[in-house]
Amino acid sequence: MLIPMLVVLGCALWAQRYQRGVADFLSAGRVGGRYVMSVASEMAGMGLITVVAATEAYYRSGLGYAFWEMLYLPVGFVLGLTGFCTYRFRETRAMTMGQFFEMRFSRSFRVTAAVIQSVSGIINYAIFPAVGARFLIYYLDLPGYVELGGWALPSFQLVMALFLGAALLITLLGGQVTVLVTDCVQGLFSYPMYLLILAFILWRFDWGTQVMPVLSSGEAGHSLLNPFEIENLRDFNAFYVFVGITGMFLGRLSWGGTQGFNSSARSAHEARMGNLLGTWRAQFYKWMSVILAIAALTYLHGRDFADEAHELRRELAS
């Protein structure tokens, strides 16, 4: 885990030399190709909290929700092939959403949008690093407190500070240039890791004798296997899928977290091709989350893992 972090920070320091002006800081000099854009932009939208949230959704709803979520794929292809929003946004030559708002509406609209985005971003950064920090503490079995200079410091706050500090360091070193390079490097690291995780889970759990009995043991009308019973699920159901598809149209290019990637491509055509390729690449992450959720269901509810599951629940409750 430490080696990839050092490699990413090294790439950030190396890429800093290419940051020479405002266009480089905000839009990476508009030099991104389709392959770099497809990897980096998808990686920018994925974090520990994203993995936790997706795994929780599949854990609660099973393969039924995963089946209907496949509708996102053709919708993503249509949006990518048509260049929906991409061409019109690049025609404005705006480098940020704020600049676009001022050009399209007014300066007061830009200020209002900036205030809303800043407040929501502060709230966002109070939740996202907290979830990621909690995950790493359990994953690495870190102690609750660390002795430092006679002070007992909570590991939770230290890991959160590490997350926030790393994000600020990478961003401030070279702006969108370093973000584009480091996200691309992280994406290249992640794909073989996805395959290793999938291979380990498929090797560790037997599908016929361990996985299927758990998936088929759901309540009547709330099957974890039958996609046509999804309307009976409480949280991640057909309405949730419909809202997600609607959001793909209404929220196109609007998320502030990846606004720098909207203007970083070499041309509008390269941006369109990057979005199209990114739709394919996102399936790696999606199915890794599905398999992780199935593994968690099997481990926590399977008869073969009853003792281990009891110990895990006791540890999480303590």
Give the location of each predicted region.
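Short conserved micro-motifs on helix faces and helix-strand junctions that flank
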Residues: 1, 30, 44, 171-172, ...
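Membrane-interface loop-to-helix entry segments
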Residues: 1-23, 95-98, 102-137, 160-219, ...
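Juxtamembrane transmembrane-helix boundary signature
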Residues: 5-22, 37-55, 73-95, 168, ...
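Glycine-rich, flexible loop/turn motifs
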Residues: 21-22, 28, 85, 97, ...
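A generic hydrophobic-helix recognition signal that picks specific residues
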Residues: 26, 40, 167-168, 176, ...
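Loop-to-helix junctions at membrane interfaces in multi-pass transport proteins
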Residues: 27-36, 53-68, 102, 143-156, ...
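Helix-loop-helix module between adjacent transmembrane segments
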Residues: 43, 66-172, 243-251, 260
